Swiss-Prot record:
It is a multi-pass membrane protein. This is Photosystem I assembly protein Ycf4. It comes from Lolium perenne. One of its GO terms (cellular component) is photosystem I. Keywords: Chloroplast, Membrane, Photosynthesis, Plastid, Thylakoid, Transmembrane, Transmembrane helix. It is found in: Plastid, Chloroplast thylakoid membrane. The gene is ycf4.
Amino acid sequence: MNWRSEHVWVELLKGSRKRGNFFWACILFLGSLGFLSVGASSYLGKNIISILPSQQILFFPQGVVMSFYGIAGLFISSYLWCTILWNVGSGYDRFDRKEGIVCIFRWGFPGIKRRVFLQFLMRDIQSIRIQVKEGLSPRRILYMEIRGQGVIPLTRTDEKFFTPREMEQKAAELAYFLRVPIEVF
């Protein structure tokens, strides 16, 4: 959801709570439980789950490897579930022409720097940059160049739903709102 008026533009960012992340976290969790149960079944010599026959699988080396894959999958799955729970990457971009201030806020991982908050003056914005990479894995990223701080990405690198036309339109609207030029590289 985005909100825009004559003097204020607020753009909310979704973060890691996306349908794809939920899907992959579930698939990875269930798959790693399957590997771990087959490894445990081969160690015990009994079928823990009747769907997965494990009498043909010897514990050493196949059962050990499957147990290792199961444990590794559980760790990766727990990492994904934690990023979803903490909603890492969500936040907002707020551009206020009336006060001349830009605020960028993002949630990170728990710790000292969980809240990433950047605030600077609009007059320090030099330009809006668009980075376009076509090919096998196309990327379109929108940056804001700040005097003395370099470039700050405004869109996530994994957002592939932007067509070139949508990216150009968003960059043009933002550059018009901020009254700065657009650069393409």
